[in-house]
Amino acid sequence: MKNQSNLPLYQLFVHPKDLRELKKDIWDDDPVPAVMKVNQKRLDIDIAYRGSHIRDFKKKSYHISFYQPKTFRGAREIHLNAEYKDPSLMRNKLSLDFFSELGTLSPKAEFAFVKMNGKNEGVYLELESVDEYYLAKRKLADGAIFYAVDDDANFSLMSDLERETKTSLELGYEKKTGTEEDDFYLQDMIFKINTVPKAQFKSEVTKHVDVDKYLRWLAGIVFTSNYDGFVHNYALYRSGETGLFEVIPWDYDATWGRDIHGERMAADYVRIQGFNTLTARILDESEFRKSYKRLLEKTLQSLFTIEYMEPKIMAMYERIRPFVLMDPYKKNDIERFDREPDVICEYIKNRSQYLKDHLSIL
């Protein structure tokens, strides 16, 4: 079949007893043992379901940890995302690649075709785990990584979930790697960015946050319209070298004109200034606001254009289409899949116009 060798094949083998255990409680994070074969290489792994609301979907997403050998291609674990609610299957990868081009740290995302016990499971997006191996691959300084796990990761002293003052400044975060001292640095950063008076904010924030990287991340959210991106769907990395925090995007399927349910989303849904306490305070400083505006203007003329994005979208679409036809959960929806490149391009056109029309308010 044409393009047959164009996606890597991941064959998963799970003992029926373990598969039954896995399916018994989809909310259980405990993994079961399994085997993964890639290019004749046999890997002993632990496998579990991943995600929150996505666990309810027919096509499951998986978290895979390598057991024997302990690492594979320089990683200790990977995520296999079903991208079930995205009719294009491409939005997450498009977004993460876009962030990377904007100059933001971003996980690598590559398509693979997955089989389980000989049965086609379909097209998946393999997502690199953001951990110490991620840092090592990029020759980045050792440091702490915190995952933003819910809406309390809002850079505020107030809880989004409880609508009252947070009982702990670490609420909303889960430490992936780092020390107890790093917990203090996270709390210190959140406390300072919320309590420092305006007159001292500019000099104080630059002691805690890489503002240039933060503005690039903010621009990435605003271009892709990830409504959830301001308060979760990210990881924080504190460089042991600079002592500064930067933000790494995560889970960007609800973007490029569709929401988390896969429904069409208006191009003006996410405002140009973004959201969250830190964003508001940073953009309140004229120097930072001007930098952000210049970044948007430059990107609107380069990366975020139909001329630049359409060839990428079409190459991705053509690469995975033969495999979508073999995906048991997606093959009957192929007509919708075929319309998606146009939907994404229409979003770029409309979003670009919205942003150009609103640059003047920055």
Curated annotation (Swiss-Prot):
Q: What is the lineage of its organism?
A: Bacteria, Bacillati, Bacillota, Bacilli, Bacillales
Instruction: Give the quaternary structure.
Output: Assembly of CotH requires CotE and GerE.
Keywords carried by this UniProt record? Sporulation
Q: Which gene encodes it?
A: cotH
Q: Where in the cell is it found?
A: Spore coat
Protein's UniProt name:
Inner spore coat protein H
Q: What does this protein do?
A: Involved in the assembly of several proteins in the inner and outer layer of the spore coat. Stabilizes CotC and CotU in the mother cell compartment of sporulating cells and promotes the assembly of both early and late forms of CotC-related polypeptides on the spore surface.
The family classification in the record reads:
Belongs to the CotH family.
Name the Pfam families for this protein.
CotH
Swiss-Prot/TrEMBL induction comment: Expression is negatively regulated by the transcriptional regulator GerE.
Q: Which GO terms describe its biological process?
A: sporulation resulting in formation of a cellular spore
| Database matches in InterPro entries | Spore_coat_CotH_CotH2/3/7 (IPR014867)
